[in-house]
Design a protein with these regions (language model features):
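A short, hydrophobic secondary-structure junction motif
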Residues: 83-86, 268, 272
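Metal-dependent phosphohydrolase cores
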Residues: 21, 199, 213, 259
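Short, flexible active-site recognition loops that position polar ligands and cofactors
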Residues: 255-271
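Active-site proximal loops enriched in glycine and acidic residues that flank catalytic Cys/His/Asp
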Residues: 173, 208-210, 232
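A short N-terminal beta->alpha junction/helix N-cap motif
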Residues: 17-25, 50-54, 261, 265
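Short catalytic-loop micro-motif centered on adjacent basic/acidic residues
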Residues: 19-23, 81-82, 103, 204-207, ...
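Active-site gating loops and adjacent loop-to-helix segments of metal-dependent hydrolytic enzymes
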Residues: 245-258
């Protein structure tokens, strides 16, 4: 059964750990993440970008697949199915499709319009028992063709959005999607501390979790980050393991070309990455 992310993130905030959001791209990705969460007794959030939703034949297909897999795999840990960086229209599509959590990314709107649209979605989500994430300050890098510069959020604007009643808030603190460049300055902990002070008990979200050093992850959690998003790292691990399998000629031996065999090393690589992150975030055994 899918659940809202509200309770798991409130527990994480109170317990000084973070829940991982791992983005899914297909059945193999979903299975690997769910099995690892169950094995480690950790709550988990499955993230779906609008691009990935389209790739997987629509949000309803995704929601139905995830619900069926939770039953088939006998998953008992809390699982939230979450729209990642949703447009206003995308949020409504996911609500209709049966997602348990949505993110409205209004960071590219003027703050007044971001507030107006977020307020409306807060009302709808709360009526349906769904969790809602909002964003202030664009996250850097590229996400489904949208390029952000890696801004630092204005703590006062963060409070304005938090006060609308969202479940969690993603504040830009110099983080970016994808690989971090060699000259990256690191997370702005001054910004994070100021935002945390303004929003109080609200769980904060760190996007672009790939490539952030472990000490910075731990410091971010100590300053109120309760949800950390990981996508690129799983993609890189999957690609490297698949490449190794093919370059070793294993696809040419026996039935090694069978997609179930060809994709297996990549799936194991995703599991290893998810396990490493859950241990780092402190969510193991917290289901």
């Amino acid at each position: 059964m899918l659940v809202s992310a509200k309770e798991m993130l409130e527990k994480a905030k109170a317990g000084h750990y973070a829940v991982g959001q791992f983005n899914i791209n297909n059945l193999e990705w979903t299975k690997a993440i769910l099995q690892t969460a169950q094995e480690l007794n950790s709550p988990v959030i499955l993230g779906v970008s609008e691009g990935a939703g389209k790739y997987m034949c629509g949000f309803k297909t995704v929601a139905d697949m995830v619900k069926a897999m939770i039953g088939e795999l006998k998953i008992t840990v809390p699982v939230a199915l979450h729209l990642d960086h949703g447009t206003y229209e995308g949020c409504y599509k996911c609500i209709k499709a049966g997602f348990s959590s949505i993110m409205f990314d209004g960071s590219h709107y003027p703050i007044a319009e971001n507030v107006e649209k977020t307020r409306e979605l807060v009302h709808v989500a709360s009526q349906l028992g769904l969790s809602l994430e909002a964003e202030v300050g664009a996250i850097g890098g590229e996400e489904d063709g949208v390029v952000g510069m890696g801004e630092c959020a204005d703590p006062n604007e963060c409070k304005m959005i938090a006060d609308l009643g969202v479940t969690m808030l993603a504040a830009g603190i110099g983080n970016i999607h994808g690989k971090y460049p060699a000259n990256w300055a690191g997370l702005s902990f001054d910004t994070l501390a100021a935002v945390s002070e303004k929003v109080g008990a609200m769980p904060l979200v760190l996007h672009g979790g790939t490539g952030i050093p472990a000490d910075q992850i731990k410091k971010a959690i100590s300053l109120g980050v309760s949800k950390i998003n990981v996508n690129t790292e799983c993609q890189l691990a999957f690609a490297a393991a698949t490449r190794e399998y093919i370059e070793a000629g294993k696809d040419l031996a026996g039935k090694g070309f069978d997609p179930r065999k060809l994709l297996a090393p990549g799936v194991e690589a995703i599991k290893a990455t998810v396990k490493e992150k859950m241990e780092l975030f402190g969510s193991v055994g917290k289901a």
